[in-house]
């Protein structure tokens, strides 16, 4: 999809990949609707995008709060914007063992990563269809392709997104809806710092693999190239991407490697 003069809604725009993608897209002379929970951080992203010459509308909300999402959507709808694309980058990660994680933590992860994402998507989809079709992207993860230690519900929530958006695409191809799954590996962001632990509180530590990961701005450039081409999947990362192929072609080796992952 050509981005020039298009209206694109981006969630998770306060930090990490979402923020980097918003800044990268702002170079394309488009109209960005930016969402996230932290309004101060959202305004910082807005300032960076405005410097690149794009128009910006802020629509803050909490992905874990359905009512908050609905209010933000209604506020945007009143402006009668012609929405051409929705790019879902908001979410939270996890750092806890299965047998030490209470259900309320599992539910919290799903409320943000799965239900929050599909809530906004279901609200925006009819608007995109009404405007003649458009592009929707959702952010998965390498562990949306396979299970991984200390990320059980995070991995499950990302698997769920694949099922939902593949179904959405099958149902709405006739409506000129295109869908992209963004699948990042280790990217140098604060996702591990902000991950939830077994108590449902902030993990507060930067993983070594995250610290050595691909810079967010480099990741964003790769993602935006893929979004422009409307690829079905955008796999982005360093050598960690090979795990997808190991899991598919040599599963016994994958399980051996995964079992050796150390506690965070």
Predicted feature descriptions by range:
Residues 30-44:
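Conserved glycine-rich Rossmann-like NAD(P)H-binding loop of the short-chain dehydrogenase/reductase
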Residues 60-71, 103:
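The beta1-alpha1 cofactor-binding region of Rossmann-like NAD(H)/NADP(H)-dependent oxidoreductases
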Residues 141:
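Residue(s) in the substrate-gating loop at a strand-loop-helix junction
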Residues 7, 14-15:
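Conserved glycine-rich cofactor-binding loop
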Residues 97-98, 102-110:
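Substrate-binding pocket helix/loop in short-chain dehydrogenase/reductase
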Residues 121, 157:
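Active-site helix of classical SDR
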Residues 174-238:
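SDR active-site lid
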């Amino acid at each position: 999809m050509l981005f020039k003069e298009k209206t694109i809604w981006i969630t998770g725009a306060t930090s990490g990949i979402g923020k980097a993608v918003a800044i990268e897209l702002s170079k394309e002379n488009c109209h960005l609707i930016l969402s996230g929970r932290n309004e101060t951080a959202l305004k910082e992203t807005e300032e960076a995008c405005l410097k690149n010459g794009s128009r910006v509308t802020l629509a803050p909300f909490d992905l874990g709060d359905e009512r908050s999402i609905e209010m933000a959507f209604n506020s945007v709808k009143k402006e009668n914007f012609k929405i051409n694309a929705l790019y879902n980058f908001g979410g939270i990660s996890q750092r806890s063992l299965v047998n030490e994680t209470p259900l309320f933590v599992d539910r919290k992860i799903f409320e943000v990563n799965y239900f929050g994402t599909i809530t906004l998507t279901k609200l925006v989809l009819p608007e995109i269809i009404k405007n003649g079709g458009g592009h929707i992207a959702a952010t998965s993860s390498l562990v949306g392709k396979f299970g991984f230690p200390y990320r059980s519900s995070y991995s499950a929530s990302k698997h769920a997104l694949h099922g939902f958006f593949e179904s959405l695409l099958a149902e709405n191809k006739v409506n000129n809806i295109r869908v992209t799954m963004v699948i990042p590996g280790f990217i140098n962001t604060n996702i591990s710092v902000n991950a939830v632990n077994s108590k449902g509180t902030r993990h507060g530590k930067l993983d070594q693999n995250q610290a050595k990961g691909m810079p967010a701005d480099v990741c964003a450039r790769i993602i935006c190239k893929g979004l422009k081409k409307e690829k079905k999947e955008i796999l982005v990362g360093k050598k960690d991407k090979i795990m997808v192929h190991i899991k598919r072609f040599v599963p016994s080796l994958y399980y051996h490697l995964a079992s050796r992952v150390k506690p965070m």
